[in-house]
Structures are given as C-alpha cells and as structure tokens.
Amino acid sequence: MAVAYADKPNHFINFPLTQFQGFVLNYKGLQFQLLDEGVDCKIQTAPHISLAMLDIQPEDYRSVDVAIQEVIDDMHWGEGFQIKFENPHILGRCIVLDVKGVEELHDDLVNYIRDKGCVADQSRKWIGHCTIAQLTDAALSIKENVDFINNMQFNYKITINPSSPARLEIVKLGAERKDGFYETIASHWMGIRFEYNPPTDKLAMIMGYCCLEVVRKELEEGDLPENDDDAWFKLSYHYENNSWFFRHVYRKSSYFRKSCQNLDCNCLGFYESSVEED
C-alpha cells in the first residue's frame, strides 16, 4: 500500500526548548550576534525542534495524541540520551542549527502515528534542525551576511532523562506563540509518567468482569472493546504496566478510580449513591 505523505502539512509534532534555560541562554547569544552584525532577519521567539510534519484534521487529534503517549511509554530510557546542537548555517531562508540525537524519536513518532491511520512525515528526507531566525530576501543576497553566518560557532548538548522537562506536543501550523512556547492542541511530559500508580499488582484483585460495563459507560465510545474478554485483557495489560490506557481510564471513570482507591469491587450499589472524589 502506498504511503501518504504530509507534503502539505497543517500540524507538526513539537519538541519545545524554551524550558531548557542553559540552551536558551546560548541560543539567544547567537541571535544577539546576528542583530549586532545588522543582519536583517526575523528572530525565532519559540525555540523548538519540529519532529514530524502532519496532515491531519480535528477528528485525528485523539489518535495522534494517543500515539504520542504510546511512544513515550515505550521508550527505553537507560541512561537517557543527548541532543546535540551545532553548526549554524543557512537552510533555505532560515538560519538553523543542526540537531543530532532525535532521529530514533522522529522515526518512532512517524511509525506510531501512521499505525493510527494518520498522515505523518514528508516525502523529502527529514533533517533535524532548530531555527534561529529567518532572513529577508535582501539579507540573503548580501555576501557579508552569508559569510558571517557561516563563520558563527555553536556547540551545546542537552541530556534528556525521565526527570527532564522535555515535552512532545501537537501544534497547528501558524499557532500563536507566548512566552517562548507555541499554543498547543496536546502536550505531554516525556518522563516516566507514574502519576497514577496501580494500587495492586493484579487488576483482578480489585475488580471482576461484572465491573466492565460500568467502566465502559463512563468512557468514550470505542475505548473498551465490546467483547468482555478483549476489554478485560486490554484494561488488565495497561493497568499492570501502568501504561497510557490505564491512566486514561483512571482519569475518565470515577467508578474505576474509586474501585482502585477502595481495593475492592463496589459495582453493587454504584447507582444507588453518588461517588465522591477524594
């Protein structure tokens, strides 16, 4: 089957960099050099890495959102990984830094998003980069500007591990920027997101098949398979591995949340009294 490409993209997967203060300090130093030299350019105010271009519609947001969470949950951190920024140069009309260390993350995002039936990545080869500024046509034609840019130096590394402030976001092309960040459709911290820890090793210790229909009614249509065996397997797997779907159900279903908190099945009488949140 032919692969569909986002050659006319309307969204992208964003890796924001503003929260990495050491990087931003050095990044702004480059921008100040350009301004001091009098290079006519538009400064980038939201430093970031575009990890994948997308051609999606609003009805695809949830699928892409889930794909991002799955990529994060399936990451093998080890000692973490480094992102290297170097070699300021001109790419098209932009002044950019080469970015190394996120190639595997790019590939995973594209593959997971495509697995959801959404269009990701372009037909041309993806080049990891971070834009510093955009040149005007006049500035691009001045040899002194080009020579100055080609002689600029930059070398910086960011270490990404589970405690880093790294995030993956869905951003619409042309989105507003504020305080160094893009307005996002969805944004997820990349760390090991044990915000909702399972209270026991086995879901069966607190729930039975009789509870599934109650949980299903509180979720969005299609979240849990209609077949109880399939639904039980899906919920149990994600519960025991503390994966994205367990946290989704925990947030969406007050009944499931209360069952986890009580370490017991309380489906009998659920409709007789309201569930109070702790």
Swiss-Prot record:
Pfam families recorded: Corona_NS2A (PF05213)
InterPro entries: Coronavirus_NS2A (IPR007878), NS2A-like (IPR039573)
Family recorded in the similarity comment: Belongs to the coronaviruses ns2a protein family.
Protein's name according to its UniProt entry: Non-structural protein 2a
